[in-house]
Amino acid sequence: MFVKEQPTGSISAGVGYSSNGGLFEASINERNFLGQGINLNATGTLASEEIRGDFSYVNPNFKGSDKELAISLFSQVDDYENSGYQNKKLGTKFATKYEIYEDIFFRPNTVIQYDKLETSGSASNLLKSRAGDFTTTSIGYNFSYDQRDSRFNPTSGTLFYYDQNIATFFSDIPTLQTIVGSTSYKKLYKESFIGSAKIKIANVVAFDEKDVKLSDRIFANTSDLRGFEPRGVGPVDNNDHIGGNNLATLSLKSTFPNPVPESLRANTFLFLDVGNVWGVDYSSTILDSSKIRSTTGIALDIVSPIGPLSFTYSIPLSKASTDKEQNFLFNIGSSF
């Protein structure tokens, strides 16, 4: 018998174009380190106003316990020179995960994070009042219920999760962050039309009459609200989006028969995203639009000889005047 070893590593890169410049992201992933099923991942992001690096270690069966052990390190610098401030954060996260009932998983975690917000003379007075050094120690947990028929391109089933993180002891600003989400999949017509509906709701509040620090504020990412930059929607201070205390999004998607040859091994889908980011606790004068944002578009995923390719084109249907659009997004990956 001849057994061919399958590749367990991958390299991926992504490029985005938006009204605020370009975005480049690259990652290296090894799914079977030392032949023990250990997952190692390193990711770097470079944008006009952001530099971020992440490294994670995940052992799915730590010491034969059937429990997952995950350790991650992260560092990020947000540099908004035109608005006169820079925010740095550095931290680590420890987590474990195990199944408590059939299809129900529990994931407790703890995070230690250090933040440093520096301002210059061009910063607004409100941003200057947010400056300082902050240490945060939080504990959190996640419950998830997963009945999807597949984790890769599912055609039926539901994924539900409830995530909460509490920062109290040894934290300069005590906060509570809650995220609830659900995604359901269903065959709409034969195998060509697979529909999905994704809902996400998030909230963050501070205690002891304090305000949520900038790095804990909520932003909509490109999978929540396509067509906009990851930091391009929500409350604005001195022409910069500062994130909100609340987020709500709804994403509807459906595949359809491929207009490209089958030899390209492609999936195409249409989508409609609706949502908003709102709420500012540290000032009532911040520009905070209640307008519901919505976008529609088309996406194409191709499995090519050089790895998976993803193209997304989005058109905003409704937006606020302060929003930053990102109409086109391209990603490329490879395996080794």
Identify the meaning behind each predicted range.
Residues 279, 284-310, 315-321:
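C-terminal structured "cap/appendage" subdomains that terminate the fold
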Residues 1, 28, 57, 182, ...:
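Hydrophobic, well-ordered secondary-structure elements that form the walls
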Residues 160-167, 173-204:
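Acidic, glycine-rich loop-and-beta core segments that form the ion-binding/anion-interacting portion
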Residues 9-11, 276-280:
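Small/polar (Gly/Ser/Thr/Ala-rich) solvent-exposed segments
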Residues 58, 146-150, 167, 183-187, ...:
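Short beta-turn/strand-loop junction motif enriched in small, turn-promoting residues
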